[in-house]
């Protein structure tokens, strides 16, 4: 409440203007025309909204280069303390999280856990192209989440690669306006039905490429006939010695490789003979 200084006038001033001095406060009923400059009328919800928008505490969360732009706000050049922003390192003391940087599939459960540990009401600002859509990793990356809104609800989207500190301040101002316009009905429905906590995406599942067995193929373990003819020591004898010195758990595998090598060499020899006959 703001009280106008004109109400604090002495008794002499009232006598000069023709008002009778009174001692009982109940009979003092002076209504001024400019009452709007003297008293502020508001509701309890607007008052609490004003308190919350003036004390947003962001969580320090950064996974990529966008966090460098966010960290520059702490300096004296931009000074985001004037907006009531106090950076916190614990999610239990924060009500705002700015997801600055790329969100990977491995980091997604940790991000959801941080969001769930934040007390209500809580807000999210998606900062950067990588956070909003996956950015340059959205085409052929198997480990990047295509938008953080697949994991947690987002209140303000801040595009850029990376966004400037002035853009971050503008996003905070827009979030402050949203907080100031919230009603009591909206506060009771924080858990909206649109919020989805999932890691699903539109990528098609494919078989794993790096299975560890690519070097166990016959063509990679046994060279061709050209290399066999260039060696002074027969390659078949080398493989036989390796089978004798190997462990018993690998005998069947090595024997199978040796048989495959013999069959492949026989096929190569037949192909060479056929080519020579055709040339003749």
Curated annotation (Swiss-Prot):
GO terms for cellular component: chloroplast thylakoid membrane; respiratory chain complex I. One of its GO terms (molecular function) is iron ion binding. GO terms for biological process: aerobic respiration; electron transport coupled proton transport; photosynthesis, light reaction. It is an enzyme of class 7 (translocase). Signal peptide: none annotated. The keyword Disulfide bond does not apply. Its main location: plastid. It catalyses: a plastoquinone + NADH + (n+1) H(+)(in) = a plastoquinol + NAD(+) + n H(+)(out); a plastoquinone + NADPH + (n+1) H(+)(in) = a plastoquinol + NADP(+) + n H(+)(out). It is found in: Plastid, Chloroplast thylakoid membrane. SUPFAM superfamilies: HydA/Nqo6-like. It comes from the Eukaryota. The keyword Glycosyltransferase does not apply. Binds 1 [4Fe-4S] cluster. [4Fe-4S] cluster binds at residues 65-66, 130, 161. It holds the Pfam family Oxidored_q6. Residues 257-280 are annotated as: Disordered. InterPro entries: NADH_UbQ_OxRdtase-like_20kDa, NADH_UQ_OxRdtase_20Kd_su. It is a peripheral membrane protein. Its EC number is 7.1.1.-. Keywords: 4Fe-4S, Chloroplast, Iron, Iron-sulfur, Membrane, Metal-binding, NAD, NADP, Plastid, Plastoquinone, Quinone, Thylakoid, Translocase, Transport. PANTHER family: NADH DEHYDROGENASE, NADH DEHYDROGENASE [UBIQUINONE] IRON-SULFUR PROTEIN 7, MITOCHONDRIAL. NDH is composed of at least 16 different subunits, 5 of which are encoded in the nucleus. HAMAP family: NDH1_NuoB (MF_01356). NDH shuttles electrons from NAD(P)H:plastoquinone, via FMN and iron-sulfur (Fe-S) centers, to quinones in the photosynthetic chain and possibly in a chloroplast respiratory chain. The immediate electron acceptor for the enzyme in this species is believed to be plastoquinone. Couples the redox reaction to proton translocation, and thus conserves the redox energy in a proton gradient. Belongs to the complex I 20 kDa subunit family. This is NAD(P)H-quinone oxidoreductase subunit K, chloroplastic. It comes from Staurastrum punctulatum (Green alga).
């Amino acid at each position: 409440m703001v009280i106008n200084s004109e109400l604090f006038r002495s008794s002499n001033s009232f006598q000069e203007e023709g008002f009778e001095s009174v001692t009982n406060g109940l009979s003092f009923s002076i209504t001024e025309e400019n009452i709007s400059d003297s008293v502020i009328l508001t509701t309890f919800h607007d008052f609490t909204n004003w308190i919350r928008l003036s004390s947003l505490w962001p969580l320090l969360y950064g996974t990529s280069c966008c966090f460098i732009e966010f960290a520059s706000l702490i300096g004296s050049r931009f000074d985001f303390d004037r907006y009531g922003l106090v950076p916190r390192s614990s999610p239990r003391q924060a009500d705002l999280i700015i997801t600055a940087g790329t969100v990977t599939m491995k980091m997604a459960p940790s991000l959801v856990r941080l969001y769930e540990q934040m007390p209500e009401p809580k807000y999210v600002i998606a900062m950067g192209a990588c956070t909003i859509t996956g950015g340059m990793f959205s085409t052929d990356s198997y480990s990047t989440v295509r938008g953080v809104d697949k994991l947690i609800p987002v209140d303000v989207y801040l595009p850029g690669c990376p966004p400037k500190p002035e853009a971050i301040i503008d996003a905070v101002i827009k979030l402050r306006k949203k907080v100031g316009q919230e009603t009591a009905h909206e506060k009771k429905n924080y858990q909206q039905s649109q919020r989805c906590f999932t890691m699903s995406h539109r990528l098609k599942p494919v078989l794993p490429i790096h299975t560890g067995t690519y070097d166990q193929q016959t063509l990679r373990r046994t060279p061709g006939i050209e290399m066999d003819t260039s060696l002074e020591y027969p390659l078949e004898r080398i493989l036989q010695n390796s089978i004798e010195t190997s462990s018993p758990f690998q005998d069947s595998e090595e024997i199978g490789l040796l048989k495959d090598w013999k069959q492949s060499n026989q096929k190569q020899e037949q192909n060479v003979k056929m080519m020579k006959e055709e040339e003749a």
